[in-house]
A protein has these predicted regions:
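Solvent-exposed beta-hairpin/edge-strand motifs
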Residues: 130-148
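Glycine-centered loop/turn motifs
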Residues: 71-78, 134, 159, 167
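Active-site-proximal beta-strand/loop segments in catalytic clefts of secreted hydrolases
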Residues: 27-31, 116-119, 142
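Aromatic/acidic polysaccharide-binding cleft in carbohydrate-active enzymes
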Residues: 1-90
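Flexible loop/turn segments at secondary-structure boundaries
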Residues: 32-37, 120-123, 146-149
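C-terminal beta-strand-rich structural cap/linker in extracellular carbohydrate-active enzymes
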Residues: 152-175
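Carbohydrate-binding surface patches
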Residues: 86-135, 167
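Hydrophobic, well-ordered secondary-structure elements that form the walls
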Residues: 16, 63, 113, 139, ...
């Protein structure tokens, strides 16, 4: 179970929402055999298909980084990225081989940011206070590590920096 397909699909979701303006996003293959595109995989262990095992996929958890936190009626917020000198990076919310970020405000007032790290190395991500003020963010991470499936990995306040492991997805939820 790796993040390869999960990251690829997360990048598609990001582009569909950020650039194509998609208002919803669905995945049609929920369960399947040994297919890379099944959210849940089933494996038979006998020739009569009477016994087997069922496993979740990293793809399911990557989709969950969006679907668990971004609720119906949410509004997408603009995201700006700056380099180390403070200069604005055009289209900085999308480095297809690095960090991709989208942000949302749910109807209940909670904020959500989904950050994809497509790179093969750890990246830093700073949360500027901007319109969200001094928000406390819960961090959830999905990565190649066993058990790191929307795993709560700590909190961070606006204005601080978050380390995002290589080839992982984090969701930050704040109020």
């Amino acid at each position: 179970r790796t993040m390869k397909t999960a990251l690829y699909v997360a990048r598609i979701i990001h582009h569909d929402i950020v650039y194509a303006g998609a208002k919803s996003w669905q995945w049609w293959r929920a369960i399947g055999g040994d297919y890379k595109d099944g959210l849940i995989r089933e494996y038979t262990t006998d020739d009569n298909f009477l016994d087997g095992r069922v496993e979740d996929s990293k793809l399911m958890w990557a989709l969950g980084n969006y679907s668990r936190f971004i609720r119906p009626g949410a509004v997408r917020l603009s995201v700006s990225a700056f380099d180390q000198t403070g200069a604005l990076i055009p289209d900085g919310d999308t480095d297809q081989q690095g960090l991709m970020c989208s942000a949302y405000k749910n109807v209940d007032g909670t904020y959500v940011m989904v950050v994809i790290n497509y790179a093969n190395e750890e990246k830093e991500f700073s949360i500027h206070k901007g319109k969200v003020g001094n928000t406390q963010w819960q961090i959830y991470r999905t990565s190649d590590k066993e058990g790191e499936n929307l795993l709560p990995v700590g909190t961070v306040k606006s204005g601080k920096t978050v380390q995002i492991p290589a080839r992982s997805i984090i969701t930050l939820q704040g109020k």
